[in-house]
Amino acid sequence: MKTYEDLEGDGGSNIVGQVVQLGEKLRSRLDKIKHKVALMSGKGGVGKSSITANIASCLADRGHKVGILDADLNGPSIGHLLGIGNDLKLETKDDGIEPGDGYQGIKIMSMDMLLKTADTPVMWTEEADATAVWVSTMESTAIRELLADTNWGELDYLLIDMPPGSDRIDNIR
């Protein structure tokens, strides 16, 4: 087995190419969205998801095309709040994953749509000693991929329901 010192460049993984490709895909998706709004708080349980769902509903009432990314991967609730359960089967097409349609036609992508049941935990790693930095890195990567892989189409607003903690906003820029 080669050690880190034995590798030249990226060791053949093309990691730089993969990161560039994800960035281009993400920019392409977000270019079709007029306004992106992240709703966040330093503390959990303060009503971010409820406020996000209500803002989306008000915008949809005014005729705007609205989507929500539930970026609270460990406590997703947007699907439930807007009428989408765990039984929804997401459809993958050539242009990406089709988001679920909630009340008022609000497009939704949420981790709870990917889990078997509402109380299924998200397991980032099998290792009991995984550090918070490692888990945070996996979370931010998952959020970027959900944004990039979801076929949002043209939207007036994309609301991003952030997880608790103010340290996460830099991870999705």
Regions found by a protein language model. Give the residues of each.
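Extreme N-terminal, non-catalytic leader segments
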Residues: 1-46, 86-87
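Short gly/ser/thr-rich secondary-structure transition/capping motifs
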Residues: 17-23, 89-93, 140-143, 163-165
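Residue-level signature of catalytic and energy-coupling elements of molecular machines
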Residues: 33, 44, 70, 78, ...
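Walker A/P-loop phosphate-binding motif and the immediately C-terminal alpha-helix
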Residues: 35-73
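Conserved, well-folded catalytic cores of nucleic-acid-processing
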Residues: 36, 40, 62, 80-85, ...
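Short glycine/serine/threonine-rich phosphate/pyrophosphate-binding segments
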Residues: 48-54, 75-79, 162-171
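Phosphate-binding loop that captures ATP/GTP phosphates
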Residues: 65-66, 71-121
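Phosphate-binding/switch loop-helix module in NTP-utilizing enzymes
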Residues: 115-173
